[in-house]
Amino acid sequence: MSTRRHFLHTALGFAALPHLARAAVPGGVSLGFSLYGMKTLSLSDALKTCAEIGYANVEFALNAGYPTEPKVFTAEARKEAAQQLSTLKLDLPCLMVNISLTADDKAHAQALKTIRDAAQMALDLSAAKPAILETVCGGKPATWEQQKAGMVERLQSWAETAEKAKTTITIKAHVGSAVNSPERLLWLLEQVKSPAIQAAYDYSHFELQGIDMEESMKLLLPRTKFIHVKDSVGEPGKFQFLLPGEGRTDYVKYFTALKQHGYHGPVVVEVSGQIFNKPGYEPVAAAQKSYAALASALAKVG
């Protein structure tokens, strides 16, 4: 488990990283880190870590057990976090909510409350530029045909709630969920047709299925408002997520394609629970290693 002593020790090594100036990122892409992968650090230390490494933005995780879970993230704590984000010049583009389109009625009602709570948190943290929301969709690939009509109904309810709360929800395809492909994700978006529902892009889930990077970007980037990035190895049914740079993804090609498709916005490292739940996981080292791999590739993209 990471400790404050480890945080202070590893902070001394930040200067050795290939630092990429935040103000001079090619193509309007900025690198970020999801605090989903820093559960064992205090929020203050997590933000300091990300800023010192060179990240331009962070994602807060609203999951149970995190310091930013809505029911424990007090008004005073939100005020302090907003001030620290400003001081460190870190943007907060997104809040991870992890709700499901295949939930039962009770869980669906809770999901709607989560949307409202997250929208309020976004305003509390930055009324001028509130963060949007991000989630996967739930279900299993094999149940898509049976569940898709119900998922549309749930998504319509999400959209209505998001519109009233003046927020945007980005939904993400996942290799293990009912929505596992660009086509299925786009189909859902087309059924609901709400500006409050957009796409989140994460190529690692498509790579595992042999889906071409360029094709997935061509389909999804016109509707994409947020990007997660990580590596992966294996195939559907038996896979392992990895840190960026540990897998097969060519990140020079990746960032070049993002630029060619006109994407402007955050590319945020998501450390999978497959990684951070392993004994000996160190969030600071993971953030450093991920930044080094991505910043090096991004610097090569003119």
Stretch-by-stretch model annotation:
Residues 50-61, 115-124:
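Conserved long hydrophobic alpha-helices within structured protein cores
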Residues 61-82:
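Glycine-rich, proline-tolerant flexible connector loops at the mouths of alpha/beta enzymes
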Residues 2-30, 39-56, 182-201, 205-302:
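Histidine-acidic metal/acid-base catalytic patches
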Residues 11, 17-20, 45, 84-91, ...:
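Active-site acidic/histidine proton-transfer and metal-coordination neighborhood
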Residues 29-33, 58-60, 92-97, 131-135, ...:
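Hydrophobic faces of well-ordered beta-strands that scaffold small-molecule active sites
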Residues 65-69, 101-105, 141-144, 208-209, ...:
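A short acidic, helix-capping loop that chelates divalent metal ions and anchors anionic groups
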